[in-house]
Swiss-Prot record:
It comes from the Eukaryota. Expressed in skin, eye, whole lung, trachea, esophagus and stomach. Widely expressed in various tissues including spleen and thymus but not pancreas. Expressed in macrophages, dendritic cells, T and B cells. Expressed in lung specifically in ciliated bronchial epithelial cells (at protein level). Expression is decreased in lungs of asthmatic model mice. Expressed in the cornea. Induction: Down-regulated in the cornea under pro-inflammatory conditions. This is Secreted Ly-6/uPAR-related protein 1. It comes from Mus musculus. The keyword Secreted applies.
Amino acid sequence: MTLRWAMWLLLLAAWSMGYGEAFRCYTCEQPTAINSCKNIAQCKMEDTACKTVLETVEAAFPFNHSPMVTRSCSSSCLATDPDGIGVAHPVFCCFRDLCNSGFPGFVAGL
């Protein structure tokens, strides 16, 4: 086999593989209890992150309800400063397959 044919076969193999496979994120469009938001969606090729937005947190004792979140695939996720004061709806971004199952700083079951 000549070098030319080898190059064509290599080019054809690379082309047939496509650009890669999109990753998956947990999704819930409406505010949902953090432990209940478990729908899995295949993200679009242009999506680069999984996004979680903290919508509500119980502010009164006895704190026995789970925080409400929305989750989605995102093509432009801008995380908020986790130490920021007064952020109404903190945003968490992550960049792996199914990485948005939790929320930083929240411990389930407490």
